[in-house]
């Protein structure tokens, strides 16, 4: 069936999908067509937000239906995600918010989101590769900087 997805900023696209398609799959198609990251999308049908895990047929969305797309600001998305899973895996959310604001000044919303996601993946990968020896070495440098300086000069106190 043919659907039209219209963003509040005026852009729109037509998509060919199955009636039993998942909303999450539709979001990926919208991302490809309108260049809006999936995590920033909120799709509405007749004023009701669509849940990713549900199917279009669950909302009685039929051929030639029109869906509205609300693009969530990147900062809001990061706050939502931060409260969910970043507390354990990543540093405190404020640093990612700050980085997000800096990126937003230099890139489009979509590009800033991609750069931030890649930066977070690289950061997580680097942290996961740290050994206990690496962590002990870092801790010693922070807790006893005078010893580290002496060792770098070639002698200990």
Curated annotation (Swiss-Prot):
It holds the Pfam family ubiquitin. Component of the BAG6/BAT3 complex, at least composed of BAG6, UBL4A and GET4/TRC35. Interacts with BAG6; the interaction is direct and required for UBL4A protein stability. Interacts with USP13; may be indirect via BAG6. Gene3D superfamilies: Phosphatidylinositol 3-kinase Catalytic Subunit, Chain A, domain 1. It comes from Mus musculus. It comes from the Eukaryota. The lineage of its organism: Eukaryota, Metazoa, Chordata, Craniata, Vertebrata. GO terms for biological process: post-translational protein targeting to endoplasmic reticulum membrane; regulation of protein stability; tail-anchored membrane protein insertion into ER membrane; ubiquitin-dependent protein catabolic process. As part of a cytosolic protein quality control complex, the BAG6/BAT3 complex, maintains misfolded and hydrophobic patches-containing proteins in a soluble state and participates in their proper delivery to the endoplasmic reticulum or alternatively can promote their sorting to the proteasome where they undergo degradation. The BAG6/BAT3 complex is involved in the post-translational delivery of tail-anchored/type II transmembrane proteins to the endoplasmic reticulum membrane. Residues 1-76 form the Ubiquitin-like domain. Residues 96-138 are annotated as: Required and sufficient for interaction with BAG6. It is found in: Cytoplasm, Cytosol; Nucleus. There is a cross-link at residue 48 (Glycyl lysine isopeptide (Lys-Gly) (interchain with G-Cter in ubiquitin)). Polyubiquitinated. Ubiquitination by AMFR and deubiquitination by USP13 may regulate the interaction between the BAG6/BAT3 complex and SGTA and therefore may regulate client proteins fate. SUPFAM superfamilies: Ubiquitin-like. This is Ubiquitin-like protein 4A. Keywords: Cytoplasm, Isopeptide bond, Nucleus, Phosphoprotein, Transport, Ubl conjugation. InterPro entries: Ubiquitin-like_dom, Ubiquitin-like_domsf, Ubiquitin_CS, Ubiquitin_dom, Ubl4_C_TUGS, UBL4A-like, Ubl_UBL4A-like. GO terms for molecular function: protein-folding chaperone binding. The modification Phosphoserine is found at residue 90. GO terms for cellular component: BAT3 complex; cytosol; membrane; nucleoplasm.
